[in-house]
Amino acid sequence: MNPLSYPRRQIFGVLAFALASVCAVAQGSPQVSPAVQELRDIGAKDPLRILQMLPDSPTFARIQTRRYDFREAGRPMEYELYVPSRYNNSRPTPLIVALHCLGAVAHDMIRYEHLTELAEERGYIVVAPMGYNNHGWYGSRGPGHEPVGGRGSLATKDDPENLGELSELDVMNVLGAVRKEFNIDPTRTYLMGHSMGGGGTWYLGIKHPELWAAIAPAAPAIFSSPDDLVKIKNMPVIVVQGDNDQFVKAETTRLWIEKMKSLGMKYVYVEVPGGDHMTVSCRSPENMTKIFDFFDQSRRH
């Protein structure tokens, strides 16, 4: 099966099982506008529908769908790329690598609300890799096709045995391709991701600290230990989490926050009262702005 055409809705039909060890429903949401509450209700029942409801933007016209020869996988692989209109090859440009959530694709991630608008306004290139398919976990749950750390692998008979390895390698290949083609500022290369992509952000941020000026995991589905944070104790981190997340418990994310605090790390924690799993990232211009503000202030030395 083509990893670009995997039936996405089937993925979220069993998402609760995939995130079994971090699954819970928090109670007591604060008062919000009817429009916001409607989005949260939809996201709780059908997360992929929220992605189908992302508002259009004039900046989407500049999004490019690219394809490269993924030799290690023996197939072509797509990724999405946004280059701001003021890009000048004579000047180093900041780059954001954006990792999509479980069941989504790169096309969805790069269209998160206000992402490309802010990239245009502030002069960032944004690239969204596929991660081989929509459930590879970017290597964060092991190199194979049966993820470690809980039930619900979401693996299919068509998945390669080294799915996790290929998912991680795809991200690194795409990063390399963008750095080769464009004048990327090595002191301003950032990593962000949502849900599965948030877990991938923790994982790849910790594994390759030499690459990133800062990272931004949102509602991160991560199955490793916060003790790993000692490897990036000098890296700035901003974390976004809803306290009413039905798939990733806020309590789990807070363990990582407490560890960052104990290590004396530079971090910002944005916990959204009543926030669900999806809208805190894909439908929150406010949170996206906070991420860009944090990136603007972060350089790798």
Description of each model-found segment:
Residues Q27-L95, S167, R254-I257, Y267-V268, ...:
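A domain-start/cap signature at the N-terminus of enzymes
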Residues P34, E72-M77, R91, L95-N183:
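Serine-hydrolase catalytic machinery in alpha/beta-hydrolase-like enzymes
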Residues P94, Y124, A213, M235-P236:
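Alpha/beta-hydrolase fold active-site loops
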Residues N2-V14:
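Bacterial N-terminal signal peptides that target proteins for export
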Residues P34, V240, Q246, A250-H301:
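C-terminal catalytic histidine-bearing segment of alpha/beta-hydrolase fold enzymes
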